[in-house]
Amino acid sequence: MKSFNHLIIHFRTYGLKHKFLYSASIMLFFWTIFDGIISYISPLVIISSGYSNTMMGIIIGTSSIAGALFDFLLSKYLQNSHWRRLYLIMFIVCLIQPLILWQSKVAVIYLLAMAMWGLYYDLLGFGNFDFVSREMETDEHASSFGVLGVFKSLGYLLAPLIVGLVIGEMLDWKPFVLALVFLSMSFIFFLILYINGKKRGIRIERLQQYRPKGFLVEINLWKKIGKVMLPFLIFTMLMSMQDSFFWTIGPILSETFVKFKPLDGLFLTAYSLPPLLVGWFIDKFKGTFGRKANYISFIISSLFLITFAIFRHPLILLFVILLSSTFSTFSWAIEQGLYADYIEDSFSKEKEIEGLVDFSVNAGYVVGPILAGFLSDKVGYFNTFAFLGIFSFFVTLILSRIAPKRVAIGG
């Protein structure tokens, strides 16, 4: 998770040497606005078809199940595919998915739309990885991924605000057309990348460094590493659940802020702002709270969420969301740093650690929407966030007590 300060440092270090990377970043920026619009309107579209919040949560949760399945299949069959092919397939799927979502009326078609959502997101991830590994020098990989991450965060920041301007009293064709406009803008930059990439020729020949160890061996490694890292993996799942709550029922709650129209998208914009800013303060925060900083910050974030049971005024809630998101972002950033340290200490287990982390994230994005939908049917949208805060508070408190001071995975 990189903030604006990373982009400034990267540009000072490399300047215009990375024009190709900046073109890819702009492509990703417009694509992320497209995806942010789809993320925002998906729960609204499903609810408008007469489905309950619980059913809506189940439908959205299937996108992460499909994503996990496609992640396995793509890693198995598209290991050496070029980023040009991966991005091109992604754009084709992205073009079809909103059209299916727009015309969906029955659950089966919604499930198909969610599966395509999971597919194109995985294609983007594989495309980004291949792009950086082929086009950037090895010692520039981490910084290059950081630049892509900044533009991605910026897109998700603006998407709710932009789509909120075109959603009226009824959800019609306008948000879908708007999403496709930004997808088209992204595709233009892809064409520029495609043409310039052909001219550049082969920059870096990718080597297959990872050899699968066999299914049973992998399962045993997952069990061994997962047992040691269990508190951290549960914590990652919890953070993913919180994020999915905001993107599942946040758009619906935003539409209840009548006084804010047409700026009701500010709800998720306030939630998406901190990831772009906390980079300047993360080291100081860690220095203040020490090795438990990730848990302490999430406990504070959860306490702010509990106040949803009390406050109803949109301006107060925006401030609460901003503060809660700020502290949860600290937790995300610190947790990612911990995983990076574990990988550095046990480099031969890199793929297994990454696989377990991805599994925890996917699990959070499956359980989160289902739980968010169910609770909002039972206790309402505001109390759902309050319940999330209470649940997160106690789980994080327990994890902070049982988490080991040091994780020894072995070489």
Walk through the language-model features, giving the residues of each.
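Juxtamembrane intracellular "pre-TM" segments in multi-pass secondary transporters
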Residues: K2-H18, G197-F232
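Cytoplasmic helix-loop-helix junction between adjacent transmembrane helices
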Residues: W117-F151
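Helix-loop boundary and gating motifs at the non-cytosolic
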Residues: L7-S64, K227-F267
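Helix-to-loop junctions at the C-terminal end of transmembrane segments
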Residues: F70-H82, I167, V278-G290, S376
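Structural signature of the two symmetry-related core transmembrane helices
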Residues: R85-L99, L180, K292-T307
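Central cavity-lining transmembrane alpha-helices of secondary-active solute carriers
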Residues: I58-L74, T269-F281
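Intracellular juxtamembrane helix-capping segments at the cytosolic ends
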Residues: L123-M136, F330-D345
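Symmetry-related core transmembrane helices of the 12-TM Major Facilitator Superfamily/SLC fold
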Residues: P175-I192, F385-S400
